[in-house]
Amino acid sequence: ILAFVPWINGEGLVSKFVPFAFITGGFYSCLAGFIGMRIATSSNARTANAASESLNRGLRVAISSGSVMGFTVVGLGILDVSVWFLILKYVFQCDSTTIANTMVMFGMGASCAALFARVGGGIFTKAADVGADLVGKVEAGIPEDDPRNPATIADNVGDNVGDVAGMGADLYESYCGSILASAALGAAA
């Protein structure tokens, strides 16, 4: 609701595209994290299977799976920045200052989503890790990350959310943020 307040009175304090840019930035940042999490979960079994044949083959599968995430982040970043620029420049004929201000808010949306994904993932990871350690080591007397401990699944999910989804959203935000910072400097000059 607060995103729409600056232009409710009609004075046009900010561009009317700012709330939508913020929302799409957050959406694409979350999408990058989600795609990274899906890639990581599907490639773990393939990497383990390939590593059972040879270490070289396992390494190739792991590196190619990781590069998919990198290309996804770059592709989503270029797609969203390009679409916003083309729409604002050629459909609505906005000036460069309005385009830069709107697209900086797109970067703020991506940054907000990345922050929540990283912090939320870190909290979930630590809570699952502590729970698995308490149940496994203290109560049952089994070693850490033992497959007999069912809390290990929650620990692995927490690692996936914190380290993969949070990192994907963070990389997307950093990539788009660097592009949009240079665009803002170019518009201000």
Briefly describe each language-model feature range:
Residues I1-A189:
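Hydrophobic, small-residue-rich transmembrane alpha-helices and their short perimembrane loops
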